[in-house]
Structure formats: structure tokens, C-alpha cells
């Protein structure tokens, strides 16, 4: 910004959202009443009273301040020409900047925009913040952030702006998975929630869509010896080792209490060999549990567990064997450690799985550097938490993408698991194609996480006009075959 513009009475400054603050700072260097200021917010006016503008025009999405609407409700090319502006300076969301560029071009007025782009290094080395211009790629951190709008190339808008649901309408969060009804898609993940009783003093567990039991094996297990947990960057490494009282004890004691809850119960069944899986399934088949989650993916046990989920033949064998002895809806829990997760998923579907849940924890190791040895007695353990979310999301996306290539009658529902911390994460998994989600590690740091996800999901669906989960499910699948 040159000095000769400092006292110009023909300056228009436009800010949107958090972009108001930078241009407000710029405005403070100009003479009072030498500029007009347009501020666009979702709600409120956020300190604009301190501006010394000739005219202050505010727009708000909710109508709480100024003009009800977005920036186009207050300014267009005709407005710029009529006001006699010679220079326009803008900072805000990319769609707003694209609009400002457009109207300034129509009005034949010089425009400078402050671009924002995600960056890593901030010194021009990583090239993560480059934007497209008529002069080639430019780095926002070093070549900007201020650019002549004439050279900026904005991407064409993607997607459709959706209308919110009517005020009296509430979105339907219910979902049906393999014939089993869930009041909402948020399920407590196996291994993190006990049998549904431990958290009852912290929040109303009946509000959950479902609860998945601890991993049950045919025989009782004491779990792994020694240290079982290590907190690491982005999550936890755990080596619990499927400690559980055994399937029969579960049927006699824990399951009746689970079934009293006003939420859908799922029995997670693990095993050490094919026979134990089959016998465990036979026992569960005689109960009232609505669904079985077949765990072929536990990474921190020496016998069975993940060994059945790493390749197609082994996975198909155990699913087929269990399928023969139970009529219960069978959801197979997959491992992220399989070299070909999609291949294993399709093999499970072909073998009789009614659904898939993915992913379990990522196999990891922690080292005790003081004693120069592995932290865990079992050496390898399971890494869980927010750091694995992008990996889990990719695998869910890939599996759903492959599922969509099957005839409709052969497709099965998918439950997304892995690093889900908030409702935004849940939306990502559902848009990737998941029918429901399971939440685990996040509950340790915030017991109310799942309730917050349910509430946030409902609010998002209402705001974006999704009346049902099915309307939102899979919308991010770009190669979807209907």
C-alpha cells in the first residue's frame, strides 16, 4: 500500500469473518473518514465500532447486525462504480475474495486482496501455501499475502450451497445396519467402554446409538502382563491383551445388564483359533444380543487376533465358519495393518459378513530408552487416537468406493472407526460413506465426547439441510456408482 493512497477518499475496504481484523489494522493507518468499510460476519459486529470509516456497512448471516445476508447483499459492481472507489482492499474467506475480484473487474476498479492458505514452514521452503496466478504459482508466505487481484486464479466453486432445514424440522439421526436399528450413528467402540456400566455416572449412556462390548474370547483371559498404556503424540499405545471374563460369563452376567440399556448392544467376539471363534459365536447366537462384531484385528495378542485379518484367505475362512453357526447380523472388524484392506473387506463380504467396521488400532512399538528395552512385554501394541484418523478415513473411503462397484444387493454397511474426536470427524466418515461411527480413545480425555458428537452432528445436518443421514452418507465419494 503506497503512501499516496493513504489520504485517498476513494478507498473501499472489505473484510469477511476473521479477515476483518487484518484490514481493520490497515484501516487504522489511513486518515479518519478517508475510506468506506464493509464487514461481513456470520453474527455480530466484533469491534468494528473502533473503525474511523466514512461509512461502515455490516452484513450478518443471521441478521443480528446491519444487513441480513452475505456480502453481495451490500455491495456489487454498480455499488463500487456509484461510490467512485478507485481502490478496493479485501481480506476474508476465499469465496468472498473471488466475489470481490469479480465485481471489481466488472467495475474496472483496482483491487488488492490478502490471500490466506494453509502453510507449514512459513519461510517459502515447503511450497505448501502456493496459489495459482496468471504469473505461475506464488507462495502466500513469501510472495504475498497481498496480491493484485487481476493475477489471482480462483478455482471454480464446488458443491451446491444447501438450504437449512425449516426451523420446526429436526434431522433424523437414526440408522439401520444389517437390519438392526440404531437411534443415532454414534457407537461406543469395543475395548474402551467396558460393558456400558462404567460411564453411567458420568453421562446418560442411553443417548448413544450403540455400545460395543469389550472383546470377548471363548475362554477367560487375564490380558498382557506389565505396563499396558503409553501416551504418545497424537494418541495412545496400548497393550491390554483382550482381558475379559470369557463369553459364557459375559452371557450370564454382563450381557443382561447391557440389554437393559435403551441403546443397541453389540457383542465383540475375538478368538485364538478358528474353533474358539465358532464356539463363541454358537453361544452368542442363543442370546438376545442384536449384533456380533467379529474381531479379527486385535494387534496386541500373540494368538489369533490380527492374524486372521491380514490376508483374504484367513479372513474369509473365519467369517465363513462363524457365518454357518449364527443367524445374528455379523459385522467384521478389520485391521489397518493388512497389506490389502480393501481385498480383505471384499473377501469378508463374499464370505457372508453383513457389515464391516474399520479400523482397529495400528500396530506400534514403544521403547523405554532408560532401560533400553521395549515398553511392553508383548513388544508390539496398538496405536490409537486422533493421529490415525486420516489413515482410517482413507481406508473407509477406499472400502466404500470398492463396495459401490458391487451390485446394490451385494453391498453391506460400513462402520467407521479411528481417531474420531468430534462431530466434524464424524461428518467426514459419514461423507466418506460410513453408515455409522465408533468412538473410543476420545472418551478417555472427555467422557462427554460422544454426546457432543451427537449434538454437533444434528446441528450440522439441520444447518446444511440434511433431513436424514442417508442424504449425507457418501456424498464425498467422487466415483460413486448409483
Predicted regions, residues:
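FNR/FR-type flavoprotein reductase catalytic core
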Residues: 1-115
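Local cysteine-cluster metal-coordination motifs and their immediate loop/turn environment
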Residues: 20-25, 94-95, 116-145
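Glycine/Thr-rich beta-alpha phosphate-binding loop at enzyme active sites
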Residues: 61-64, 236-237, 244, 298-314, ...
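Glycine-rich phosphate-binding active-site loops on the catalytic face of alpha/beta enzymes
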Residues: 93, 213-218, 296-298, 355-365, ...
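Catalytic cores of alpha/beta
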Residues: 125-128, 197-202, 276-286, 338-351, ...
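Alpha/beta catalytic cores of nucleotide-metabolism and tRNA/nucleoside-modifying enzymes
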Residues: 141, 163-170, 384-411, 421-482
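C-terminal helical cap(s) of enzyme catalytic domains, especially alpha/beta-barrels
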Residues: 146-155, 223-233, 367-380, 443-467
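N-terminal capping/small domains of soluble enzymes
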Residues: 169-265, 270-272
Amino acid at each position: 500500500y503506497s503512501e499516496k493512497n493513504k489520504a485517498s477518499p476513494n478507498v473501499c475496504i472489505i473484510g469477511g469473518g476473521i479477515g476483518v481484523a487484518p484490514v481493520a489494522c490497515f484501516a487504522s493507518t489511513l486518515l479518519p473518514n478517508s475510506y468506506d468499510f464493509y464487514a461481513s460476519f456470520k453474527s455480530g459486529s466484533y469491534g468494528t465500532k473502533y473503525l474511523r470509516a466514512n461509512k461502515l456497512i455490516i452484513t450478518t448471516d443471521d441478521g443480528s447486525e446491519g444487513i441480513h445476508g452475505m456480502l453481495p447483499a451490500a455491495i456489487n459492481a454498480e455499488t463500487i462504480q456509484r461510490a467512485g472507489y478507485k481502490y478496493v482492499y479485501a481480506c476474508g474467506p476465499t469465496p468472498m475474495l473471488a466475489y470481490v475480484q469479480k465485481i471489481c473487474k466488472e467495475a474496472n476498479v483496482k483491487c488488492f486482496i490478502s490471500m490466506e492458505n494453509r502453510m507449514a514452514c512459513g519461510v517459502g521452503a515447503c511450497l505448501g501455501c502456493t496459489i495459482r496466478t496468471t504469473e505461475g504459482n506464488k507462495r502466500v508466505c513469501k510472495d504475498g499475502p497481498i496480491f493484485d487481484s487481476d493475477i489471482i486464479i480462483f478455482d471454480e466453486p464446488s458443491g451446491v450451497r444447501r438450504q437449512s432445514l425449516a426451523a420446526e424440522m429436526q434431522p433424523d439421526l437414526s440408522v439401520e445396519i444389517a437390519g438392526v436399528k440404531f437411534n443415532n450413528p454414534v457407537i461406543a467402540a469395543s475395548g474402551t467402554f467396558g460393558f456400558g456400566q462404567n460411564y453411567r455416572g458420568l453421562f446418560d449412556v442411553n443417548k448413544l446409538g450403540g455400545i460395543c462390548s469389550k472383546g470377548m474370547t471363548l475362554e477367560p483371559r487375564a490380558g498382557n502382563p506389565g505396563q499396558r498404556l503409553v501416551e504418545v503424540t497424537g494418541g495412545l499405545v496400548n497393550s491390554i491383551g483382550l482381558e475379559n471374563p470369557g463369553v459364557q460369563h459375559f452371557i450370564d452376567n454382563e450381557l443382561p445388564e447391557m440389554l437393559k440399556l435403551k441403546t443397541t448392544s453389540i457383542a465383540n467376539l475375538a478368538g485364538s483359533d478358528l474353533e474358539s471363534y465358532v464356539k463363541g459365536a454358537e453361544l452368542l447366537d442363543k442370546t438376545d444380543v442384536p449384533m456380533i462384531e467379529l474381531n479379527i484385528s486385535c494387534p496386541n495378542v500373540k494368538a489369533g487376533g490380527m492374524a486372521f485379518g491380514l490376508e483374504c484367505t484367513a479372513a474369509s475362512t473365519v467369517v465363513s465358519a462363524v457365518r454357518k453357526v449364527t443367524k445374528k447380523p455379523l459385522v467384521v472388524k478389520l485391521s489397518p495393518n493388512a497389506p490389502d484392506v480393501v481385498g480383505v473387506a471384499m473377501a469378508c463380504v463374499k464370505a457372508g459378513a453383513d457389515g464391516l467396521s474399520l479400523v482397529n488400532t495400528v500396530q506400534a512399538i514403544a521403547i523405554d530408552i532408560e532401560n533400553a528395552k521395549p515398553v511392553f512385554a508383548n513388544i508390539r501394541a496398538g496405536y490409537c487416537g486422533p493421529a490415525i484418523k486420516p489413515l482410517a478415513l482413507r481406508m473407509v473411503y477406499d472400502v466404500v468406493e470398492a463396495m459401490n462397484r458391487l451390485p446394490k444387493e451385494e453391498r453391506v454397511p460400513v462402520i467407521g472407526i479411528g481417531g474420531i474426536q468430534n462431530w466434524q470427524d464424524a461428518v467426514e466418515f459419514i461423507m466418506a460413506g460410513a453408515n455409522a461411527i465408533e468412538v473410543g480413545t476420545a472418551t478417555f480425555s472427555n467422557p462427554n465426547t460422544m454426546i457432543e458428537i451427537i449434538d454437533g452432528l444434528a446441528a450440522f445436518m439441520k444447518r446444511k439441510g440434511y433431513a436424514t443421514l442417508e442424504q449425507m452418507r457418501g456424498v464425498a465419494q467422487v466415483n460413486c456408482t448409483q
